[in-house]
């Protein structure tokens, strides 16, 4: 529908047009990462089971549960690499690219096409050849909704949403005007709304994604990663690449310094726990439990400069 000419002004957004995954018949724009996962499952041969790692957010289980696909769980090692399960020829395996730093090419080759890649924390890593992959731009930039499903075959689109994303965009404006802490409750409410409705990506999110310079954001993320790794690589128990091939979501640090998480939070560094439900579902000796308790996802995104990374490194090392 053509918009009205004249009248009050709306948001005036630049148009960079370099979002990594343009919409196409094989790339569906939906309103969340879990909706993108569901979109892929609906467009693939129905599996007898799907294997999902234990080290993952519980929301990923919503899609197979809604589609009544039986779920089995499998483990990963201490370097965030999959320990492939005994999947049958009619099973699917969900591989997770953790923070954009996992190399899944060998695992995908072993599975011979019986896999989907969860790249919700790996926006800048393109799909492996022939492997369906889904993304969550909301973890990388300020948009109210959004998920992307990419496949080596045409995808049937989800239905249009009946509501407007403006109702769950409040947290973005609130953070801008009042700060992050004031917007936490609104952010959690917006997340809950996305749990209950799968549909297409909103017009607002499409416009906002077009207004972000993703190339510049990727360069900033890589520079910040290099700064952190140069300072912290010597204490990090994770064997991370010195120069990752694609821009990561964060710098995952495991170092065993007592009280470090609380000290950083007290210093104003937001450190989400990936993932708290894993701790309650596993014993203390499991790899997943240890990762959930000890992994510190240090922020390195496009909002921050070299001096910010130096300050963060000093807080940890001093």
Regions inferred by a protein language model and the residue ranges of each:
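A short alpha->loop->secondary-structure connector
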Residues: 115-116, 133
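Short, acidic/turn-prone active-site loops that include or flank metal/cofactor-
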Residues: 56, 75-81, 119-122, 137-141, ...
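Active-site PLP attachment segment
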Residues: 130-175
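PLP-dependent aminotransferase class I/II
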Residues: 3-10, 17, 21-28, 33, ...
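Short secondary-structure boundary/capping segments
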Residues: 85, 107, 125, 243, ...
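Short, charged, surface-exposed secondary-structure boundary motifs
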Residues: 80-85, 124-130, 142-149, 282-285
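PLP-dependent aminotransferase-like
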Residues: 3, 7-27, 35-110, 114, ...
């Amino acid at each position: 529908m053509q918009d009205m000419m004249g009248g009050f002004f709306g948001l005036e957004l630049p148009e960079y047009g370099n979002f990594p995954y343009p919409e196409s018949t094989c790339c569906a724009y939906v309103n969340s990462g879990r909706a993108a996962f569901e979109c892929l499952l609906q467009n693939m041969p129905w599996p007898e089971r799907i294997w999902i790692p234990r080290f993952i957010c519980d929301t990923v289980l919503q899609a197979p549960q809604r589609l009544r696909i039986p779920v089995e769980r499998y483990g990963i090692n201490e370097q965030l690499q999959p320990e492939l399960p005994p999947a049958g020829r009619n099973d699917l395996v969900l591989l997770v690219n953790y923070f954009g730093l996992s190399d899944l090419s060998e695992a995908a080759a072993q599975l011979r096409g019986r896999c989907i890649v969860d790249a919700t924390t790996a926006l800048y890593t393109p799909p492996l050849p022939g492997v369906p992959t889904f993304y969550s731009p909301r973890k990388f930039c300020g948009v109210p909704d959004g998920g992307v499903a990419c496949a080596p075959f045409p995808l049937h689109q989800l239905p249009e949403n009946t509501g407007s994303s403006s109702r769950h965009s409040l947290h973005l404006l609130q953070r801008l005007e009042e700060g992050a802490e004031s917007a936490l409750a609104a952010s959690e409410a917006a997340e809950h709304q996305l749990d209950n409705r799968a549909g297409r990506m909103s017009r607002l999110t499409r416009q906002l994604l077009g207004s972000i310079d993703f190339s510049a954001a990727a360069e900033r993320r890589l520079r910040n990663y290099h700064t952190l790794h140069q300072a912290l690589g010597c204490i990090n128990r994770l064997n991370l690449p010195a120069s990752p091939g694609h821009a990561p979501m964060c710098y995952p640090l495991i170092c065993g310094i007592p009280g470090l998480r609380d000290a950083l939070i007290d210093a104003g560094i937001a450190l989400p726990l990936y993932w708290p439900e894993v701790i309650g579902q596993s014993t203390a000796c499991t790899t997943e439990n240890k990762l959930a308790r000890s992994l510190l996802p240090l922020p390195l995104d496009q909002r921050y400069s070299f001096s910010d990374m130096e300050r963060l490194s000093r807080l940890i090392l001093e």
